[in-house]
């Protein structure tokens, strides 16, 4: 990737056509996972302005009971499951698809 691109541009490029977690994005970009999570709401707004693309959020899932966090508005991983109180939660994955 060219170094002159901003982190948001690089994240958009990586998640276009695929789905990655914030941890995977952080590893690929060499930046902290928290920083990736701070960029995501801005990326959602950028993609929403483009009618030819849409942001996809694969929600977090509890690894113990299978609860799916469908109604969650935050883009980060939840701390624990509201059903079984387990902390084993699969991270959400993000992607961008063409309409």
Regions found by a protein language model. Give the residues of each.
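Alpha-helical residues within the helix-turn-helix
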Residues: 27
């Amino acid at each position: 990737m060219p170094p002159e691109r901003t982190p948001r541009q690089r994240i958009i490029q990586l998640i276009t056509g695929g789905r990655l977690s914030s941890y995977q994005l952080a590893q690929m970009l060499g930046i902290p996972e928290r920083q990736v999570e701070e960029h995501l709401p801005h990326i959602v707004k950028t993609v929403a302005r483009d009618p030819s693309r849409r942001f996809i959020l694969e929600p977090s899932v509890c690894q113990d009971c299978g609860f799916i966090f469908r109604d969650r508005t935050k883009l980060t991983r939840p701390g624990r499951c509201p059903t079984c109180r387990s902390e084993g939660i699969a991270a959400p994955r993000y992607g961008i698809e063409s309409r």
